[in-house]
Amino acid sequence: MSFRRKKFCAFDAKNLQEIDYKDVNTLKDYIMESGRVVPSRITGTCAKHQRQISRAIKLARYLALLPYCDTHQ
């Protein structure tokens, strides 16, 4: 029997209501080296903020603030 660790949402702890797409340094923490969005089971963010993170990353990519992938192979 395994016990799951309680999720800890960093955005709830900071009382952030909205995740800004212009805050590139924060968004980079939630992107893998391959360019994929890190899942919430790894980051521990709640579902509400995970959706906001993915929307902000997609918008920042569209506006060329973030790359779609770091390495092209």
UniProtKB/Swiss-Prot annotation:
Per its UniProt record, what Gene3D superfamilies does this chain match?
Ribosomal protein S18
> What's the source species' lineage?
Bacteria, Pseudomonadati, Pseudomonadota, Gammaproteobacteria, Legionellales
Q: Which gene encodes it?
A: rpsR
- GO annotations of cellular component type: cytosolic small ribosomal subunit
**Which protein, by its recorded name, is this?**
Small ribosomal subunit protein bS18
Pfam families xrefs:
Ribosomal_S18 (PF01084)
The record's keywords, sorted A to Z, are: Ribonucleoprotein, Ribosomal protein, RNA-binding, rRNA-binding
Presence of the UniProt keyword rRNA-binding in the record: yes
- Assembly and binders: Part of the 30S ribosomal subunit. Forms a tight heterodimer with protein bS6.
